[in-house]
């Protein structure tokens, strides 16, 4: 029963949060992406540092890419973007609810569900957006970047370290947990994020180069706004859902496994 409620609550949260995220993206981020895409065919030459293994077939590959997305420039592209937002929100809602349940198990149920949802969502924002983006900020289409594998490895390192730091602060009781968290947060930047050698917009010149620089700056703030709105909405939705539908069966399960927790449950109610 608890598992079924978890799935349904995550789905409800995903539909609400994913819809809000889609609206924010359509309002602020998508226009920037579409504006940047108009400059892609003005790139004079690819940057050697980011050439793929199939560079010899780059021109044919680009034609296939353009053809594949031509039909998706309108409603179809919007539909799949919304589906992707809902699926991502579903996975994040599951994660938030599980961490909230872990909080209740480890720290009791005296803390209001909405407050726990805010703390967990803030940790999710720091782990999955803020800390990785400090080294690998979002880029507009047409921007050259460092090698994909190196970026993936560093992103994963940043997520693991920041997530571990949040878990240490949230669940550890030792007094030096702040030092451990600070050390974990510093690891990705001691290693160093992969950087591109040279100008990321080296293939562009004149007006295109200046326009893409401006769009890149706007896109940086747009992605941060979208991420903040996502996690803020997640907290606002997850708190009431957890309190109404997930906390009661969770308390019952905790009481069944540990009779001593009955006092904590009564205090929370």
Residue ranges and their predicted role:
Residues 8-32:
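N-terminal signal-anchor transmembrane alpha helix
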Residues 59-91:
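Individual transmembrane alpha-helix segments
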Residues 84-100, 157-162:
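Hydrophobic alpha-helical transmembrane segments
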Residues 104-140, 195-204, 263-269:
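Hydrophobic alpha-helical transmembrane segments of integral membrane proteins
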Residues 120-122, 176-188:
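Central hydrophobic cores of alpha-helical transmembrane segments
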Residues 138-179:
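A contiguous pocket-lining binding segment that forms or flanks enzyme active sites
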Residues 184, 244-269:
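Short, highly charged, low-complexity non-transmembrane loops/tails of multi-pass membrane proteins
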Residues 201-224:
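Short, membrane-exposed interhelical loops at transmembrane-helix boundaries
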């Amino acid at each position: 029963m608890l598992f079924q409620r978890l799935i349904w609550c995550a789905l409800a949260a995903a539909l609400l949060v994913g819809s809000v995220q889609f609206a924010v993206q359509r309002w602020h981020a998508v226009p920037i992406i579409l504006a940047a895409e108009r400059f892609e065919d003005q790139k004079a030459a690819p940057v050697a540092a980011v050439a793929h293994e199939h560079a010899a077939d780059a021109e044919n590959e680009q034609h296939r890419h353009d053809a594949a997305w031509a039909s998706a420039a309108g409603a179809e592209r919007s539909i799949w973007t919304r589906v992707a937002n809902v699926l991502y929100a579903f996975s994040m809602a599951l994660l938030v609810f599980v961490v909230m349940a872990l909080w209740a198990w480890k720290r009791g149920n005296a803390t209001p569900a909405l407050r726990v949802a805010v703390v967990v969502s803030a940790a999710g924002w720091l782990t999955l957006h803020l800390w990785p983006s400090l080294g690998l900020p979002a880029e507009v289409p047409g921007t050259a970047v460092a090698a994909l594998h190196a970026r993936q490895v560093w992103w994963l390192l940043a997520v693991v370290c920041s997530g571990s730091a949040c878990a240490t602060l949230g669940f550890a009781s030792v007094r030096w947990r702040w030092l451990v968290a600070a050390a974990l947060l510093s690891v990705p930047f001691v290693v160093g994020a992969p950087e591109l050698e040279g100008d990321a917009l080296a293939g562009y010149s004149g007006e295109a180069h200046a326009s893409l620089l401006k769009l890149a700056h706007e896109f940086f703030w747009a992605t941060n706004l979208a991420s903040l709105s996502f996690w803020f909405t997640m907290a606002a939705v997850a708190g009431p859902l957890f309190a109404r539908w997930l906390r009661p069966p969770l308390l019952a399960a905790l009481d069944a496994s540990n009779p001593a927790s009955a006092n904590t449950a009564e205090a929370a109610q």
